Structures are given as structure tokens and as C-alpha cells.
Amino acid sequence: MDGVLVDFEKGVIEKINSELSSDSPKKPKYANKVIKQLGRNYITRDDIKKYSPGKSKAATRYMYALVHDDEDFWSNLPWQPGGKRLWAYIRQYDPDILTSPMDKRGKNESLSGKLTWVKNNLGLSPEKVNFAHDKWKFAVSEDGNPNILIDDFESKTKPFTEAGGIGILHINADNTIRILEVLEQSDEAP
């Protein structure tokens, strides 16, 4: 969901930068550490990107502190560029959504926020949304056929494929749709 249909990075950068430029930011201890570590009162994608060599620990901690329990944040994230086009293509297959929750410290607001986003933007019921960190466990359907996972992290698609599913590393909507079209015309389509 995040990085495929939803632009989590854009949403979280806007939220963090709004707080860092405020005279009284939420979680000021975390905000001050970000400003001290980066030497500026704003972050960029590289400061929070999961596998970026320039990732900031202070910015990442602030990100979790700000949004892990903010249901409104999760339910109002923007669409990923190309996300609507991708959804228009894949919805014909009646897909489920498989997404990782940000459930740090036992908080579940990201789950309810993501469910709201899915309902409002995709029109799906909660039964069509699955939350899991170990996405590979969903690689094969109950009837033994491989499922398809579209994810923006190879650390998710590779184990999914190794477990018998079809993992598609999402780079952009056009590329993912092309891969799906090839699968549809091959014997590998579920």
C-alpha cells in the first residue's frame, strides 16, 4: 500500500517539516534532536528513506513518534504518483490489500487509519485488508495457487517469491502494469 498506492514519504515529510518549522513543535525533544543532527529545520526523503545511506536516526525516531499513533495522518495520506492508474488496472482482479502496520509500542492507530484510507479511496471493506510484517506468509493462496505481491521493497518481494508467490518490485505504475500484462499472458498468472 505505502509506496505503491499511497505516498507515505510525501505525507510524512510534510508533517515533519510542518512541525520542525513551528515555534512549538509536537514532541519537542525529538524535533530538537533532528535539527541538531541535520543542522536544519526540515527533512528530505533521504533523511527517512529506509535504505538510504544518508538516513537520519533522529528524523526516523521523530517520524515514528509523530505518526505511529496518528489515525488522522494515515487516513489522509496522498495517492502515490501513478497510484490511481495502477489501482484502475488491478481492481479488475478483485485484489486484497497487504500492508505493514506501523504498530510501534503496541499502538494500532495506523491500522484504523489505513482501513479508513482504503475505504475512502478504494471502496474496499476491512475484510479485504490484511496487515502483516511477514508478507511472505501470504505467498500462496488456500487453493495452492501463487498470489501476487506488489511492493516497493525488495526485502518484501524476494521472500514472497521464495515462498512460492509472485513478487513484483514496484518502481512506478507503468512498469508494474507492464509486468502484470506479461503475467496475464503467460502461464504464471494466478
Model segments located where?
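Short, structured coil segments at secondary-structure junctions
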Residues: 91, 125, 162-164
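Acidic, Mg2+-coordinating phosphoryl-transfer loop and its flanking beta/alpha structural elements
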Residues: 145-182
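Short, acidic loop-to-helix structural element flanking the phosphoryl-transfer center
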Residues: 50-97, 107-112
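Substrate-recognition "cap/lid" segment bordering the active-site pocket of phosphatases
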Residues: 98-147, 154-157
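Active-site neighborhood of HAD-like aspartate-dependent phosphohydrolases
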Residues: 1-65, 162
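A structural signal for well-ordered alpha-helical scaffolds and beta->alpha junctions
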Residues: 5, 9, 80-83, 108-115, ...
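Short amphipathic alpha-helix with an adjacent loop that forms part of the alpha/beta core around
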Residues: 138-143, 179-189
